Amino acid sequence: MGKVIGIDLGTTNSCVSILEGDEPKVIQNPEGARTTPSVVAFKNGETQVGEVAKRQAITNPNTVQSIKRHMGTDYKVDIEGKSYTPQELSAMILQNLKSTAENYLGDTVDKAVITVPAYFNDGERQATKDAGKIAGLEVERIINEPTAAALAYGLDKTETDQKVLVFDLGGGTFDVSILELGDGVFEVLSTAGDNKLGGDDFDQVIIDYLVSEFKKENGVDLSQDKMALQRLKDAAEKAKKDLSGVSQTQISLPFISAGENGPLHLEISLTRSKFEELADSLIKKTMEPTRQALKDAGLSTSEIDEVILVGGSTRIPAVQEAVKKEIGKEPHKGVNPDEVVAMGAAIQAGVITGDVKDVVLLDVTPLSLGIEIMGGRMNTLIERNTTIPTSKSQVYSTAADNQPAVDIHVLQGERPMASDNKTLGRFQLTDIPPAPRGVPQIEVTFDIDKNGIVNVTAKDLGTNKEQNITIQSSSSLSDEEIDRMVKDAEENAEADKKRREEVDLRNEADSLVFQVEKTVKDLGENISDEDKKNAEEKKDALKTALEGEDIDDIKAKKEELEKVIQELSAKVYEQAQQAQQQGQEEQGSQDSTVEDADFKEVKDDEDKK
């Protein structure tokens, strides 16, 4: 097998690495830098990628940054009369990294391991694979960024068992994963995160502050000026980086705008304490997934042996302090947060090619997967934090008599109701032979491959007819959706429980109506017209109640119908017992006559003797 490169496709910066011997090596780009800005620019039909594209972003409106935030969505960028998808733009960045690796190796590269945030959903993972394909790369593996970081950190530490927390705050995404390392096995215990939180947001709070201060002083709103905003973005990013090393920085942007009396200049001094005040809510947002990951792993902070910081945003002193305070441990400083993920990807590439031996990586799926069932509920087949690859099957049936098809609504999330979770896809299994409800057996199978990509199959066990779908979602998970999936599951536990009970009640009532109809039909003439009429009335009353929203009324009507069916069952049972008893008496009478005859016959014989 040829060389397989490791790529960290980041929101703000990307990095490429290769395994040399048994050590991962980061490859410098033509400018001599070890990371490449994830920026693409178009000018007069020419495409520019990296530092050269970033440098002219202020003057060129056809510059695209942070496209990773739109992966897996239907977002498009219109430039010079052409629409570009996030996959196409990401492919341009990947092509640049591929070229960097080829120049270094002096050989063609066509295989790669690419990293993604652990909390990327299936559509986002698929989009990343597609970007690789467009770039001319066969994506051997999609690997989670925190897992890759742990591989790079722990490759030479496999003799001792330890539990590691990876805190990955990148340019546009945030992940936290907990792994157990030992005997060459890297097992992910849990993962949590936020796909819409990263360094860009820290830049934005500085931009908002600068816009606000400038407006107070000059009465001009810079947020309406695209070129001014780009200059502010560059200045904010630089100030953020400066404040990781110094306690105060000067932001100076001459000729940022113009007023009635001529040019206006922006001159603001920003202190580290002011920046920390502005970014406080963002830092707090990283703590909730950290606690969630610990909870899901079943670990306390004292059981964590090492904390690894990944991503450029972890250089912010306030972030480091927050992690230290939360975990009670000084973060490990032995890895480069900008390069460690790409290095881990190169190690995984080495595992695939066989160059790295005795290393086993066990990753997990970040969110639960299931399908919608009767009553609008989500039935979970694969729980979040399940080790992948994995497969799980469950048998379902039809909800109506002679139902010719079933709709399979594939969901991802943690809430009990389907509508509160993320739709990954829908497909239909048709040509189900006519049969009473509950009789057909439909086996639904979820397969998650090593890349975390989902394949769902539905099979009619009666006919062996099969239908499947590989999830290719067209929309990403927003902050609100992720909150609904994970955090709201706990916050709305009581409301969820009530809705779950309501759905269960409706399903039980619906099943009871069907049972009564079947029982009355089966009994036929064995029940009186009066009993039949009473059962029909109570059944119709429950059906009417089910059409309404009054839960207490449904419960009351259900109890009345249950009482009726119990009485019917009791009567039928009594009739059956009476019939059986009568049959036994008749049989007993016949048996008795036979015994008398035998007895007399014996007696006659004795008399003759």
UniProtKB/Swiss-Prot annotation:
The keyword Phosphoprotein applies. Residues 574-587 have a biased composition (Low complexity). Disulfide bonds: none annotated. Keywords: ATP-binding, Chaperone, Nucleotide-binding, Phosphoprotein, Stress response. Pfam families: HSP70. The modification Phosphothreonine is found at T173. Residues 525-554, 574-609 are annotated as: Disordered. Residues 525-542, 597-609 have a biased composition (Basic and acidic residues). GO terms for molecular function: ATP binding; ATP-dependent protein folding chaperone; unfolded protein binding. InterPro entries: ATPase_NBD (IPR043129), Chaperone_DnaK (IPR012725), Heat_shock_70_CS (IPR018181), HSP70_C_sf (IPR029048), HSP70_peptide-bd_sf (IPR029047), Hsp_70_fam (IPR013126). It comes from the Bacteria. Induction: By stress conditions e.g. heat shock. SUPFAM superfamilies: Actin-like ATPase domain, Heat shock protein 70kD (HSP70), C-terminal subdomain, Heat shock protein 70kD (HSP70), peptide-binding domain. NCBIfam families: PRK00290.1 (NF001413), prok_dnaK (TIGR02350). Acts as a chaperone. PANTHER family: HEAT SHOCK PROTEIN 70KDA. Belongs to the heat shock protein 70 family. This is Chaperone protein DnaK. It comes from Staphylococcus epidermidis (strain ATCC 35984 / DSM 28319 / BCRC 17069 / CCUG 31568 / BM 3577 / RP62A).
